[in-house]
Amino acid sequence: IIVPQLLNPDGSLQYSVRRYITIGKLIAREFTHGKDSSNNKEVSEYLCKDIDYNQTQEIDWAIGASFFMKREVYAELGGFDTDYFLYMEDEDMCLRSLKIGRPVIYYPKSKMIHNHLRASSKFGKKMFIHAHSMMTFFRKHGLSPQR
């Protein structure tokens, strides 16, 4: 799986690369109200603020705004897991890919504009869908997912 560098509509870098969610990172993310600008250590680690976003590198996963993969890799993975209606399907796909020896590569020479809205950070139906998808993810991969 290849993922491009994502930019905000104003051209600034979007923190689109992630480390796997854990209960600790989830709690920290909730306490910071999903703000990517937070200086919270757990949130910064989850958002991979410590990596060089100009360097091609293997990563855990990236938000699913744009994935590139060969058709045979998609088939080998069985496509997207239909247990996820919305949210977490990108993290699940990348983890399954890594588990079968197919790396996820962040490729910053390819750039895309992404208007990231974080609709699930507001209390409402999408937040409940996101919570349900997280429970599905933890049930399938454990509370501290590993490659």
Regions found by a protein language model. Give the residues of each.
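A short, conserved alpha-helix in the catalytic core of glycosyltransferases
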Residues: 52-54, 60-78, 83-111
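Short, hinge-like loop/turn segments at secondary-structure boundaries
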Residues: 17-23, 122-125
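Residues that scaffold the ATP/ADP-binding catalytic core of kinase and kinase-like folds
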Residues: 16, 26, 30, 76-77, ...
